[in-house]
Amino acid sequence: MDVSVCIVNLNAKQHLASCLNLLPESLGSCSYEVIIVDNHSQDGSQEFIQQEYPGFHLLINHRNEGYTQAINSAIRVSRGDYLAVLNPDSEPGPNSIFTLIEFLKMNENIGIVGPKVIASDGSFQRSCRRGVARPAAVFSYFLGLAKRYPNDQRFTGYHLNHLDENEINEVSGVSGSCMVIRRKTLKDIGYFDEQFFAYQEDSDYCLRAKERGWKVYYNPHSIVKHRGGMGGANSVPMKAIFEWHRSYYKYYFKHFADDYSMIFNIFYSIAMVGKLIFAEGKYLIKQ
């Protein structure tokens, strides 16, 4: 088995067919299996998958334990030499996953690779390639400095805006909306860290891979369209906002807190709580 395509679904029925129907063309000549974990959807997703895609392996969670727990469930039963982690609101382009797998086959020291990800309108999703999310890079992103000064590397350390989006580059992380992982890398570093309910589990996983000596690459010769925020995030927006901020907090304290003073760690905590309150307040006002 060449590749196991692993998808976590939560109330994304309206987008599933677009994703699943494009898989054969995206995989080229690869032999593959598709494993879908449904995270307690309430929109008829489970019945839809069972009726329309009986050849796919469906795992059903009876409550939402979080994205990371669900993707690990899929990985544990997978058999492929490569793992393609894919969001249900993603639309993989022709030979997109095949291209990433061939890239890994030609580069034995690369453990993880991600494609160029575009939005529905064709615009580039900068979050598909990442630097290390240290405080300076994260705050530049939060404050909009990276977007305002896209060519200034003092501010673009997180989404690497200064790099050409059409060039292959080594990066520190790629997006879990679509990433391909070598089985040997999985055996070396283990599963995704389930302390992350959702969000930043992909950045954490890539950083762990790099710490073990694996390289992580962005390859724009593979293109995947990602609607973003559909399904799970849209189902419970306040929960999504909370988990997004909590994951950044956990990521920082897992990897970087020991590099900074206690005073700075307190400041970081206060800043994240403040941003969470602002984000949730902004959402409620819009309602």
Task: Name what the model sees in each region.
Residues 83:
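Short aromatic/hydrophobic "clamp" motif used to bind/position activated sugar donors
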Residues 207-286:
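Active-site-adjacent helix/loop segment of glycosyltransferases
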Residues 61-78, 99:
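Glycine-rich, basic loop-to-helix element that forms the pyrophosphate-binding segment
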Residues 21-31:
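Short, acidic, metal-binding catalytic loop of nucleotide-sugar glycosyltransferases
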